[in-house]
Amino acid sequence: MTLLEIMRPANCVMAGAASLTGMLVSGALLQSLHTPVLVFSAVLLITGGGNAINDYFDREIDAVNRPDRPIPSGRISPRAALIWSVALFIAGCLIAGLINQSCLALALLNSFVLIIYAARLKGLPVAGNIAISYLTGTTFLFGGLAASPSSITAFLSILSALATLSREIVKDIEDLPGDLAHGAKTLPAFIGKRKSFVLASLVLIVAMLLSYLVPLGIDYQAAVSIANLAFLLSIKRMLCGDASGSQRWIKMGMGMALVAFLIGYHI
């Protein structure tokens, strides 16, 4: 159970579902059961590897902030957690190789990014946020590469990455008091809350504008407009200095935008 817990299975399942969504909008999810199972499994394992190695590098911080986590609680040794994460990365990449070369290449690249993020990028301003946004967006792209890559999947990946980047910046704003107390090098700590809110808003506006370029029908346009309304409400909360409320609206908007893609594809 400890090996499963350190993978954070809920996050793994959500990532796997995102990859299947990318496959779905590429029009190949329902053609056979074999490839979707491989796609879901590869993403689940690589995400689990990323979560496990993240716990490995965060073990000293978790000993203070989250002593109940598997490593600081003593339920698994740091060495065992590291070996487990490497095994998950290898298994995920091997499965990706069974799909096609494009999926294997992306799996290898994302495994590398997950390792570098946990080891180096997490504590750097902007770089860590961009890494998380990239990983979120390419989860959808992975599913598309397993099928027949399309502009729709590319748009879904880009829009997801942009919305995630905005949300990551807002999360850092919300955590600013604690980060300043501990000397964390986040973007808001460098440029301040106001400029960070402006940047997060601009990123979200770019995402909203790009959403209308997606080559889907009027049903999609109507549905994505509702999602964009949620994003506008998020920006309004930013202008009011409400990071927590802004985050909630971004999450709602992302969910609505995903539904818009599915509606546009007549699911």
From Swiss-Prot:
Reactions this protein catalyses: sn-3-O-(geranylgeranyl)glycerol 1-phosphate + (2E,6E,10E)-geranylgeranyl diphosphate = 2,3-bis-O-(geranylgeranyl)-sn-glycerol 1-phosphate + diphosphate
A single GO molecular function term of this UniProt record: magnesium ion binding
NCBIfam families: PRK12882.1 (NF009521)
Keyword NADP applies: no
Compartment(s) where it occurs, according to its Swiss-Prot or TrEMBL record: Cell membrane
Needed co-factor(s): Mg(2+)
UniProt-recorded name of the protein: Digeranylgeranylglyceryl phosphate synthase
